[in-house]
């Protein structure tokens, strides 16, 4: 059954009262202002409203068998709520059904408790998207190639491109991340335009943060540039006003306009160079934390009139009043049509999308890779070669040269130093954290892509693109061998022990061979002092916390001839080491954000905090923070991606070998 996305309002679908009168007010059922505000903005999202008013989803849904409902469907609930709000001849209504089914969208949500509006929005979008994919999968029944397109993705989905260019040889490496919204840092900005400029500002990778160029085969100075590869039909922007789990709120005014033009931020590879948007909704938060205060929304109806929707109280407003508010979430709709050529991005499996919500579309839209929930910003990193989206390579995440048989350091390597992240979203890998909280993808969930955000116990969500970034196996094999050509390790786009959608890592190559051809010593791999045997006989090694004792000795020992900066005590070395730590921290946290780990931590910590607050009452803030960290530390550490641990080991290894004056 065909369906073409209709971006403008279809007045014939609206009831007379809803077409000429104000929006339907939604009664507050007990701290449900966040839910009411999100529902009002979704209701007045034209393409989604048109889709729901024609019952495109429920008419194909499998939740009813022989007229009896088998289970509650999140998309059916949303569709029915939106259609009712645009059809009934009432002044106010109560969103009873969706309020009573909160756990369908997020297990940790609780009726009667204040929740974050942006978090709820992402869960709703994610649930509807995944429901569409489930129905689509049933319809295909494994007989045809399956892609990750849905009506939700066609409405809210876009893609960001991250390009790293070697400043020595000019070689470029491109990577794409799908998004469902964008989260912007506002602490150092005064306007949405300024925040966007900072988000897409180029970055020079130099010093301790150099990039390993495959063409040059060495560490080089490079330029990293973020840009928009595919602009979404509906652009959702979150202004990151909340500073963290234990932080406050950024309550300053951030200016924004009715018109938003993204041409300055578009990728050169995009077929859509001039996307223009017009504001149609905002959500405002008044108060000092996401767990308290009050949410209300402004929406523009089908006749272009602005209304303030404050739960059941709806009043006529003006554009000037809207632009004067301290907005938390902005909703923009494209005012110029997306070119047909911009809808021809190649999917991860190279197939063309012909369906939306399981229905064929007259204008198929292709995206890069399937969405796996949001962990959007994202979730995983998708990669592609410039000019060839189907066969692609990710950015090289590893800085040093490969060395085989180097066991990665375990969790204790990251136990204390990973404190700040560069939400993204972005965009913004699905990493399950068993803390009773489901993370959206995107966003990022992230779907959420995140850039330079802090990961302190609730992070300020800077430059995060709620992505639904998803990692895609490029389909290319990367071969790594030892320096003498022996014992090569072959990885199909993934690190050992990781899923096939993670970035391939260079295992360590053996640096010293034995004289008799016996086993190489792990001890001989350590540059700061050699503890290995010379006859090729391997020594037994004990392990503590996942790190071999001989390995630890090798990494931390030093000699007079080749002093290791990790052990030097002079002030100059200490300062240089601190700079190295900051570089490692920045890269590690950027990776944690892009893979969705940061968002998992954020949502899990929020849920734990609320639960403990309810159970203990007025617990001291410092005690609450300590207990929360104790509760989640071990489980979250175990979820840190293995490729990140291996990369940090490699880089620390290279640092320990380097001679410093």
Curated annotation (Swiss-Prot):
Stretch list, region Disordered: 387-406, 449-558
One GO-annotated biological process of the protein: proteolysis
InterPro entries from the UniProt entry: Papain-like_cys_pep_sf (IPR038765), Peptidase_C19 (IPR050164), Peptidase_C19_UCH (IPR001394), TF_EnY2_sf (IPR038212), USP_CS (IPR018200), USP_dom (IPR028889)
Active site (catalytic residues): 33 (nucleophile), 294 (proton acceptor)
Alphabetical list of Pfam families matching this protein: UCH
EC numbers on record: 3.4.19.12
Key words, A-Z: Hydrolase, Protease, Thiol protease, Ubl conjugation pathway
Reactions it catalyzes: Thiol-dependent hydrolysis of ester, thioester, amide, peptide and isopeptide bonds formed by the C-terminal Gly of ubiquitin (a 76-residue protein attached to proteins as an intracellular targeting signal)
Biased amino acid composition, Polar residues: 462-475, 545-558
Domain of life (superkingdom): Eukaryota
Basic and acidic residues composition-biased segments: 449-461
EC category: hydrolase
A molecular function GO annotation: cysteine-type deubiquitinase activity
Domain USP: 24-335
Similarity-based family: Belongs to the peptidase C19 family.
Purpose of the protein: Recognizes and hydrolyzes the peptide bond at the C-terminal Gly of ubiquitin. Involved in the processing of poly-ubiquitin precursors as well as that of ubiquitinated proteins.
Alphabetized PANTHER family for the sequence: UBIQUITIN CARBOXYL-TERMINAL HYDROLASE, UBIQUITIN CARBOXYL-TERMINAL HYDROLASE 36
Protein name per UniProt: Ubiquitin carboxyl-terminal hydrolase 25
